[in-house]
From Swiss-Prot:
Official protein name in the record: Fluoride-specific ion channel FluC
Gene Ontology biological process: cellular detoxification of fluoride
Keyword Cell membrane included in the entry's annotation: yes
Cellular compartment(s): Cell inner membrane
């Protein structure tokens, strides 16, 4: 594979994913006073999609360049571990320990659950 095509695929996917995350953040601003719903929703959606797509593309061939676009670019741009970590740290920094631990626990446990749900949906309904 041409490395330049890989770079372009990741850059384009990253732009789309980052814009989607920004749109989610804007859409959740009204309800996101005490809890970072934008990051939470973007990360869970990314987990669901990686479960769906990874499972699906184990059986259906797609090019390496398109995989880079989807997984490294789009889903990498949509999800954000650094923002999640900073938001969690912010809870601890302000003494909101229950919210911090709750956010940490919910994000990790529901993220893993969404990957599993994505795999299940893909195997049960898409890969018959």
């Amino acid at each position: 594979m041409d490395p330049v095509m890989g770079i372009i695929a990741v850059a384009l996917g990253g732009a789309v994913g980052s814009l989607a995350r920004y749109a989610i953040a804007l859409g959740t601003q009204k309800i996101a006073h005490a809890f970072p719903f934008g990051t939470f929703i973007a990360n869970l959606a990314g987990c669901l999609f990686i479960g769906l797509l990874w499972s699906f593309f184990e059986k259906i061939h797609i090019s390496h360049t398109f995989r880079l676009f989807l997984f490294t670019g789009l889903l990498g741009g949509l999800t954000t571990f650094s923002t999640f970590s900073r938001e969690t740290y912010g809870f601890f920094e302000t003494g909101e320990y229950w919210q911090g631990f709750g956010y940490l626990f919910l994000s990790i446990s529901l993220g893993l659950a969404m990957v599993a749900v994505g795999f299940f949906i893909s195997h049960k309904f898409l890969l018959r």
